[in-house]
Design a protein with these regions (language model features):
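Short amphipathic
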Residues: 59-63
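Rieske [2Fe-2S] iron-sulfur-binding domain
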Residues: 65-166
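A short, polar/charged loop/turn motif at coil->beta-strand junctions and beta-hairpin connectors
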Residues: 52-54, 69
Length: 167
């Protein structure tokens, strides 16, 4: 059956005639030129950011880069930074590289550690993104943030050894 699909008549039916061309001549689909402003125009960059980059799966790295619990990679894209970290159960989780307290960047480069510590106010986050300690925990008038606050998570998945995330 598979051989027929790729080598026989069924293949012709699958790829011979695209179903939607919006009335365009297929010979003219790539005829328009791309203007230089696509590469340096802020308005175009903003449109790409709002309508594409925040809605697609992005490659963060390879699974072999973070094999042990606590291993993590940092992926920066324009104004965002994401941490992908190997969990103790072997799964992967991703978080914005930004403290849940005041937004300070947590880590600068790929490494391995048991937790993430904010360099600004010293909040500590577990590998699962939960706040696990803060200085002077009893001094918070609204109550301790430990166990209540966490890093903002991004969706992570893998395919064939590649690590992907989406915002």
């Amino acid at each position: 059956m598979i051989k027929e699909i790729f080598l026989g008549e069924k293949m012709d039916k699958i790829v011979k005639h695209p179903s939607v061309l919006d009335g365009k001549n297929p010979n003219e689909l790539r005829g328009d030129s791309i203007t230089n402003d696509r590469y340096f125009c802020k308005d175009f960059m903003d449109k790409e950011w709002n309508h594409m980059w925040t809605k697609v799966w992005l490659i963060a790295g390879r699974e072999v880069q973070i094999e042990e619990p606590g291993d993590y990679i940092v992926h920066d894209l324009v104004k965002e930074s994401v941490i992908i970290v190997r969990q103790k159960d072997g799964s992967l989780r991703g978080f914005y590289n930004s403290c849940a307290h005041r937004g300070q960047r947590l880590v600068e480069c790929d490494s391995s550690q048991d937790s993430f510590r904010c360099p600004y106010h010293d909040w500590q986050f577990g590998l699962n993104g939960d706040v696990i300690s803060v200085p002077d925990e009893d001094d918070y008038p609204q109550g301790s943030p430990v166990g209540k606050r966490k890093l903002v998570e991004v969706r992570v998945d893998t395919w064939d050894g590649f690590i992907f995330y989406t915002m």
